[in-house]
From Swiss-Prot:
Species this protein is from: Schizosaccharomyces pombe (strain 972 / ATCC 24843)
UniProt keyword list: Mitochondrion, Transferase, Transit peptide
Boundaries of every Rhodanese domain copy: 43-140
Protein name: Putative thiosulfate sulfurtransferase, mitochondrial
PANTHER family per the UniProt record, alphabetical: THIOSULFATE SULFURTRANSFERASE RDL2, MITOCHONDRIAL-RELATED, THIOSULFATE SULFURTRANSFERASE_RHODANESE-LIKE DOMAIN-CONTAINING PROTEIN 3
Annotated transit peptide: 1-25
Xref: PROSITE patterns: RHODANESE_3
Amino acid sequence: MFSKTLSVSRLLMTRSFYSSTVVKNVSIFDFEKVYNLSKRPTGDKSTVLIDVREPDEFKQGAIETSYNLPVGKIEEAMKLSDEEFSKTYGFSKPVFEDNVVVYCRSGRRSTTASDILTKLGYKNIGNYTGSWLEWSDKIKSK
């Protein structure tokens, strides 16, 4: 029985290790990094900041310079032509080499979004895991 428990434990540890390696392709962004992104000059398109919450959540408050693309629409959106994407979402479709940073309310949906973008072939993904909850709290003191 002990060896069976040990085998299950090893399996769980192995799964945990391998599932966390996917995250290694994604940079974790903190408040300061995102704050600096939000203060970029208007024409600076070096990084795209995407809020993956639903449109009604986005309308209630969002980080400056961010665009809204709900997590449930990311996969189909990224398959649109550049023109159709821009027309539908109001910003230029990121290319695979662009720096893309995602956030949501608490970090869960942004983690899902970063996984989707990675699987679609995007190379430079950032996840602001503190997301809107942290942002709306910390921005008050800035």
